[in-house]
Design a protein with these regions (language model features):
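Beta-rich, blade/repeat-based domains predominating
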Residues: 36-50, 80-107, 140-166, 198-224, ...
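Blade-level signature of beta-propeller repeat domains, shared across WD40, Kelch, NHL, RCC1
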Residues: 306-346
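C-terminal segment of classical bacterial N-terminal signal peptides
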Residues: 14-24
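A short helix->beta-strand "capping" segment at the edge of beta-propeller domains
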Residues: 25-38
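Structural motif
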Residues: 113-119, 174-181, 227-233, 275-281, ...
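Beta-propeller fold detector
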Residues: 32-35, 69-79, 128-145, 189-201, ...
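Short loop/turn segments that connect beta-strands within beta-propeller blades
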Residues: 66-70, 122-127, 183-187, 236-241, ...
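Short loop/turn segments immediately following the C-termini of beta-strands
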Residues: 58-59, 109-111, 170-173, 214, ...
Length: 346
């Protein structure tokens, strides 16, 4: 018990915000629309050196970048699949991650489980013709079914650690795999199942993922979309050993991101059971409680799917939109909250 308590204290101190110093009133938060007309956008990455925002415009089967307030196609021609219970969402590309300024990793969602791919691309220059989804750098990697395991798909979240790229997968609901793509230079060498999250948390559907400032693999376990309040926040070392696991009280965590200035941890909650009351939350420690953390609401958002900070502490968030509910034209958005993790100068 003593060892667990010490570890839990460490996680609470270095990973979470504290209630007293980080209160944010909703009326102080201004959400700006950056781009409209997206179709179930499901991933964000900020291009190194340029700060340009790239989006997985998933239902439109493409990756775009934001230039002068407009979505410019970068990679097109992904295949289509769908996801959801009740509302059904078209999906293509999902998670995004830059390895350097010109090298983008894309997690797929448009193929059947076992045929889904993680792919690497050299992005064209701004204004150039978009490239086709099949024009990859190196061979795409998959996690096909074996005699003992079902095939994996829906590579929703990507996060780069010291050992490679950690990928959340939604194929085997009994295991809830986070997989690891190891790199050879700027190409994927091997892709293998790494952390069976459901086996240790007893909750399925790892979706959100990031790397903590201390190098821990940080996973948002979405849980069942038909069950309220079951999302978890779990920390692993890069060997796959669980370090700690916390109840959040959130419904369906879709994104996690640490602010670049303060190192505060933020989460998006899609809230499938009540999408009008999804939102952005800051994760806060509860003193002397080693099983739960507090999710402090920053602002309500409808159907948030992913988030990413730029180097100035501005937070970008994708909102899926209402095409699954009969909207005639795609109405997904990229929104921004300026300076959410800004450190004022003395």
């Amino acid at each position: 018990m003593k060892k667990f308590v010490c570890l839990a204290n460490l996680m609470l101190l270095v990973v979470f915000s504290t209630t007293s110093s980080l209160a944010v009133a909703q009326d102080e938060v201004e959400v700006e629309t950056v781009v409209e007309g997206l179709n179930n956008p499901s991933g964000i990455a900020i291009q190194p050196e340029t700060g340009v925002v790239f989006i997985a415009d998933s239902g439109a089967l493409r990756v775009v970048r934001v230039i002068d307030g407009k979505a410019e196609p970068v990679i097109v021609g992904f295949t289509r699949d769908n996801y959801g219970k009740g509302p059904i969402y078209d999906i293509g590309p999902l998670g995004l991650l830059f390895l350097d300024k010109d090298t983008l990793v894309v997690g797929g969602g448009g193929k059947p489980d076992g045929e889904e791919m993680i792919r690497v691309y050299k992005v064209p220059d701004p204004g150039a013709e978009p490239i086709k989804a099949e024009n990859t750098e190196g061979e795409p990697k998959m996690l096909p079914a074996t005699d003992a395991m079902v095939g994996e798909g829906n590579f929703y979240g990507l996060a780069k650690g010291a050992k490679g790229i950690y990928v959340t997968c939604n194929g085997d609901d009994q295991k809830g795999w986070v997989s690891l793509a190891t790199l050879s230079g700027l190409k994927i060498d091997k892709f293998e199942r790494k952390i069976a999250t459901k086996m240790v948390t007893l909750v399925d559907a790892p979706v959100a993922i990031t790397i903590s400032p201390e190098g821990h693999v940080t996973v948002g376990q979405m849980g069942e979309i038909s069950v309220a309040g079951d999302s978890l926040l779990t920390f692993y070392n890069e060997d796959g050993k669980m370090l700690d696991n916390f109840r959040t009280g959130l419904n369906d965590i879709t994104g996690l991101a640490y602010g670049p200035k303060h190192g505060r941890l933020f989460a998006t909650d899609f809230n499938w059971l009540d999408t009008d009351n999804g939102g952005l939350y800051k994760i806060i420690a509860i003193k002397d409680n080693y099983e739960e953390c507090k999710a402090q609401e920053i602002v309500k958002l409808k159907k948030p799917t992913a988030l990413a900070f730029d180097s100035d502490g501005n937070l970008y968030i994708t909102l899926a939109g209402n095409t699954s509910e009969g909207a005639e034209t795609p109405d997904g958005k990229l929104v921004m909250i300026k300076g959410l993790d800004f450190v004022p100068e003395d």
